[in-house]
UniProtKB/Swiss-Prot annotation:
Pfam families: ZnuA. This is Metal-binding protein YtgA. Part of the ATP-binding cassette (ABC) transport system YtgABCD involved in metal import. Binds Fe(2+), Mn(2+) and Ni(2+), with a preference for Fe(2+) and delivers them to the membrane permease for translocation into the cytoplasm. The lineage of its organism: Bacteria, Pseudomonadati, Chlamydiota, Chlamydiia, Chlamydiales. GO terms for molecular function: metal ion binding.
């Protein structure tokens, strides 16, 4: 029976998510804090989306630490005191790649480093998914599509097993369990988001972090083939929220909202809200437009990666007039 099908299992799921959140908060230690109990094996992940998955694979076999945590923009992160030491003491370093860690200080320590596992580059090399780009730059937000991120999890497991073959059985068993859960979440997300009326399937967000999500969950098969799925999402900022937003950017989104009768725009947890508030205020008179009640999480997580994905699915489904299926 599906894990989401009954009210009983709904309650069980929420309880498990709370426990998982507590577990993951402890298993992915902040790079700013606690000394490990076992100093022999360290694995460093560049962000929580990666670390939450790596820690599920490794369990307590290694000490997992995360470099970029909390409400910090991974696009613009510059290394601080202690980061170089954390990289030096780690046997493996997992990065997202695809231009996410693009600051000069990070590139200096990641590029050419034999300990680095570049997940995005591995997916590109295998050509197993059509990875996206915008104006010639790769889109790094692969964790918003559960299928693509599942392929990244397979690469995490493969790298961990290669580095620590003594734990192969445990790591593979844990990875298989995670992948099974991710397949279930992917099906649940697709079913829930498909209940949104087609005329409402337009996603307006703070920056262009939800293209993978839109292609997978808000578009038809025909739109994915033709590329017309791109018309289902828009934002005033590009792939990275570092650039200044111009009046032209704002008016471009205002016209999109008007043309597609969009009624809801979505704030993002770590982004400045001024641009979207201006967009709402600039909308044409008589048009109903409002901010979503809850922000989305794009470049960070709330409790952990898995509950964050569920939060985004629930928020988008409910705000756009669909029904969250349990």
């Amino acid at each position: 029976m599906s894990f989401f099908h009954t009210r009983k299992y709904k309650l069980i799921l929420r309880g498990l998510l709370c426990l998982a959140g507590c577990f993951l908060m402890n298993s992915c230690s902040s790079s700013r804090g606690n000394q490990p109990a076992d100093e022999s094996i360290y694995v460093l992940s560049m962000n929580r989306m990666i670390c939450d998955c790596v820690s599920r694979i490794t369990g307590d076999r290694v000490k997992n630490i995360v470099l970029i945590d909390g409400a910090i923009d991974p696009h613009s992160y510059e290394m601080v005191k202690g980061d170089e030491d954390r990289m030096a003491m780690s046997q493996l370093i997992f990065c997202n790649g695809l231009g996410l860690e693009h600051s000069a200080s990070l590139r200096k320590h990641l590029e050419g480093n034999p300990k680095v596992v570049d997940l995005g580059q591995r997916l590109l090399n295998k050509n197993c998914f059509d990875l996206l780009s915008e104006e010639g730059f790769p889109d790094p937000h692969i964790w918003t599509d559960m299928r693509v991120w599942g392929a990244a999890v397979k690469e995490m497991a493969a790298a961990l097993i290669q580095q620590f073959p003594q734990y192969e059985e445990d790591f593979q068993k844990n990875a298989d369990q995670i992948l099974s859960e991710m397949e279930e979440l992917d099906r649940w997300a697709a079913r829930s988001l498909s209940t949104i009326p087609e005329k409402n399937r337009y996603l307006v967000t703070g920056h262009n972090a939800f293209s993978y999500f839109t292609r997978r969950y808000l578009s038809s098969d025909a739109e994915r083939v033709s590329g017309e799925w791109r018309s289902r999402c828009i934002s005033p900022e590009g792939l990275s929220p570092e650039a200044q937003i111009s009046i032209r950017d704002i008016m471009r989104v205002v016209e999109y909202i008007s043309a597609n009768d969009v009624e809801v725009v979505f704030l993002e947890d770590t982004l400045n809200q001024d641009a979207l508030r201006k967009i709402v205020s600039c909308s044409k008179s008589g048009q109903k437009i409002r901010l979503a009640k809850s922000p989305l999480y794009s470049d960070n997580v709330c409790d952990n990666y898995f509950s964050t994905f569920q939060h985004n699915v629930r928020t988008i489904t409910e705000e756009l007039g669909g029904t969250v299926l349990e």
